[in-house]
Amino acid sequence: MKKMNIAIDGPAGAGKSTVAKQVAQALSFLYIDTGAMYRALTYAAIEHHVSPDDEASLKSLLDSIEIKLVDEQSKTRVYVNNTDVTDQVRTEEVTKTVSLVSSHGQVRKEMVRQQRLLAEGTNCVLDGRDIGTYVLPNAELKFFLTATVEERARRRYEENIQKGFKQSLEQLIKDIASRDEFDSNRSFAPLRKAEDAIEIDTTSLSISEVTQTIIGYVKERV
């Protein structure tokens, strides 16, 4: 099979990461969790007391740390300077701050450079908000996952309960709607569907159903 890059984009809580992971596992492709890379930088910024508004300092911090992703069957482990921060990058504080950190042009350009290097010459699945439009505009297959704000908030609420995080469903609905607006209106590489992306509404679909739908499209291309 010739090299294939699969881009999966969509708003927060649409199921991108879980689906991307399962698609990659089913096809024996590399999974690159781009969101975890931004979360790792956000975590480091909080630890180093770097303001999420300070683009220059964030870029300097990014240049000074090593972010590593280790793909395991059950999850992607995230390391900053060889320290496992997999759980720390999923806290509420990081989640609330990551959109602002990732909105800066200098930060995104460097992250995208790293992501393109990882994807070069290999079969891989990447998920994020600008994979099909900016990171890998020439990806062989592009998907855009959507779901209602209420459904996405419900999924995040259940995830948080499993992780021991407490946040009301009503607040999550507000937070996700706010993040949608921010991500869609940022000046650099905003969240939007690529013209050639296949849109899948996941509101009433299971993870398995979405995964199988994407795999079906992949098999058509092989």
From Swiss-Prot:
Keyword Cytoplasm assigned to the entry: answer is yes
Supply one GO BP term.
Answer: nucleobase-containing small molecule interconversion
Does the keyword section mention Transferase? yes
Per the UniProt entry, the Enzyme Commission number(s) are 2.7.4.25
Keywords attached to this Swiss-Prot or TrEMBL record, sorted alphabetically, are: ATP-binding, Cytoplasm, Kinase, Nucleotide-binding, Transferase
Where, by residue number, does ATP bind?
A: 10-18
Biological source species? Halalkalibacterium halodurans (strain ATCC BAA-125 / DSM 18197 / FERM 7344 / JCM 9153 / C-125)
Q: Which InterPro entries match?
A: Cytidylate_kin, Cytidylate_kinase_dom, P-loop_NTPase
Gene3D superfamilies with a match to the protein in the record: P-loop containing nucleotide triphosphate hydrolases
Q: Read off the PANTHER family from this record.
A: CYTIDYLATE KINASE, CYTIDYLATE KINASE/PANTOATE-BETA-ALANINE LIGASE
Q: Which family does it belong to?
A: Belongs to the cytidylate kinase family. Type 1 subfamily.
Q: Which reaction does it catalyse?
A: CMP + ATP = CDP + ADP; dCMP + ATP = dCDP + ADP
Gene Ontology CC annotations of this record:
cytosol
Q: What is this protein called?
A: Cytidylate kinase
Q: Which Pfam families match?
A: Cytidylate_kin
GO MF annotation list: ATP binding; CMP kinase activity; dCMP kinase activity
Its localization reads:
Cytoplasm
